[in-house]
Structure formats: structure tokens, C-alpha cells
Amino acid sequence: MAEMRPGPVVGKQLNEQPDHSPLVQPGLAELRRRAQEEGVPETPQPLTDAFLLRFLRARDFDLDLAWRLMKNYYKWRAECPELSADLHPRSILGLLKAGYHGVLRSRDPTGSRVLIYRISYWDPKVFTAYDVFRVSLITSELIVQEVETQRNGVKAIFDLEGWQISHAFQITPSVAKKIAAVVTDSFPLKVRGIHLINEPVIFHAVFSMIKPFLTEKIKGRIHLHGNNYKSSLLQHFPDILPLEYGGNESSMEDICQEWTNFIMKSEDYLSSISETIQ
């Protein structure tokens, strides 16, 4: 009988390998070669193994897809300096202190990080859509350093209670396109789910503006829970939701404060990657 030999380690199997594994080296070497050949800038972030692995893991080690994602990341940053060149958290500290955003302490059953955004804590007279988007980008740049998050991605909960016309006016077609670009194929994080709760009728006009820019895969991961959301939301996130959303975890106030503290402790790192890419 012929000896059974294991097949090559590919895709999701490679995703489970640690950064220093010899099995990931060929992919790293090829992605680095392409980046250097194309003249990808080594500032503000050098082409270290850890940095390159973000793109490889985000696309399950498909080199062509990882390379496309990497090019899109640099293209987006070059085209949106108003966001990418200003990741200093003090510019959005008021929004954070208001309780707009937090990251849950525990991951969901699939290992995804879970982010919560609360629209009622965004005062559109004080903060623009770009400020709100910057909060998300800052969090993304911090959690993408986590290997488990690179492997298992993120899920976001948007509590749209309090959404008003003044919020809607902030989301222009240009802003909608930039948001969609990051969600789909311009940032090295797997978006595993987008959950909307308390969505009012007037929000659907904005949603219709963003939707054409999204891929079919992302569209299929959007869940509209409405006002009676607690039972359906708990099915997706059992045991990890804060008290306000039907769970047994801490209050949103505590969760938001903890994440704000973490962002402020990361100020030096965020400043170091705040740079306009030519």
C-alpha cells in the first residue's frame, strides 16, 4: 500500500500558523518582493513580517488577493489624507468620552472581535462624519495588531437609536464610497458581520447610498434587527453583550471608558503611523 503523505498546508491552515512558522515564509517573501518591486513606501509602517501577515491572513494566504488588498490599502490612504494622516486620538477624544464607541471584552463564539457604535452619542453639530469614521479607523489600526483578530476578523453592532436628519446630511456619496472601500477591500481585517439595531425609517436612505459600493459577500453579512433586537442579537453574541443590550457583561459606560483608556495609551503608536502617503 502506498504511503499516505500529508498534502500542502494552504489557506486557513496557514492562517493558524504563528508569525515565526517556516510554513508562512514563502508567502511572506513573495508579498515583500512584490511590494518592494512596486516601490511600496516603508513609512509610516515598515514591511515587517508582522505587518505583511495582516494582509496574508485577511485573505487566507491567497497571494494575489493579499497583494490586491495591500495595494488598495495604500491607495486608499493616499487618496484620503484627511483620515489616514490624522490618527491622533485627541482629535476625537470628546466623541470617545461621550460613550460613542467601545470594544467588548470577550470575543464572540467564532473568535471575532465585537465593536459597538452608538449613534445617539454622536453630536453632528460638534463632530463630522470624518471624525466618526476616524474613530473606527483608529480602533481598526489597533486591533489589527492582534493575531487572533487577523485570523477571525471583526463584527460591528451599530445602535442607530437617535439617528436624525442632521446625521444623514453628513453622509455624502463621497463619504459613503470611502466607508465602503474600507469595509470591502482596503483594510486588512475580515468583516464577519454588521448588525444594525434600532434603525429608523430615515436611515434607509443613507443605507441605500452605501449599499451599491459594497460587495455581495459584505451585503450578505449585514443583519437588520430593528427595535425588538435583543433575542436575535443574543443568538449571534451569547454571553458577551453588555447589560444595556440584554447580556450579562459590564455596562456600556465601563466598556467605552476601558476602550477610550486603551486608545489614549496607544497615542504614541497612532501618531507614528499618522502620515500622508504619496
UniProtKB/Swiss-Prot annotation:
SUPFAM superfamilies recorded: CRAL/TRIO domain, CRAL/TRIO N-terminal domain
Tissue expression summary: Liver.
Residues bound to a 1,2-diacyl-sn-glycero-3-phospho-(1D-myo-inositol-4,5-bisphosphate): 208-211
GO biological process: embryonic placenta development; intermembrane lipid transfer; intracellular pH reduction; negative regulation of epithelial cell apoptotic process; negative regulation of establishment of blood-brain barrier; placenta development; positive regulation of amyloid-beta clearance; response to nutrient
Location(s), subcellular: Cytoplasm
PROSITE patterns xref list: CRAL_TRIO (PS50191)
SMART domains, alphabetized: CRAL_TRIO_N (SM01100), SEC14 (SM00516)
Domain of life: Eukaryota
InterPro entries documented for this protein: CRAL-TRIO_dom (IPR001251), CRAL-TRIO_dom_sf (IPR036865), CRAL/TRIO_N_dom (IPR011074), CRAL/TRIO_N_dom_sf (IPR036273)
GO CC annotation: late endosome
Segments traversing the membrane: none
One Pfam family matching this protein: CRAL_TRIO_N
List of residues binding (+)-alpha-tocopherol: 187
Domain CRAL-TRIO: 88-253
Keywords: Cytoplasm, Lipid-binding, Transport
PANTHER family named among the record's database cross-references: ALPHA-TOCOPHEROL TRANSFER PROTEIN (PTHR10174:SF225), ALPHA-TOCOPHEROL TRANSFER PROTEIN-RELATED (PTHR10174)
Task performed by this protein: Binds alpha-tocopherol, enhances its transfer between separate membranes, and stimulates its release from liver cells. Binds both phosphatidylinositol 3,4-bisphosphate and phosphatidylinositolphosphatidylinol 4,5-bisphosphate; the resulting conformation change is important for the release of the bound alpha-tocopherol.
Quaternary structure and interacting proteins, as annotated: Monomer and homotetramer. Phosphatidylinositol 4,5-bisphosphate binding induces the formation of homotetramers. Phosphatidylinositol 3,4-bisphosphate is less efficient in inducing tetramerization.
Protein's recorded name: Alpha-tocopherol transfer protein
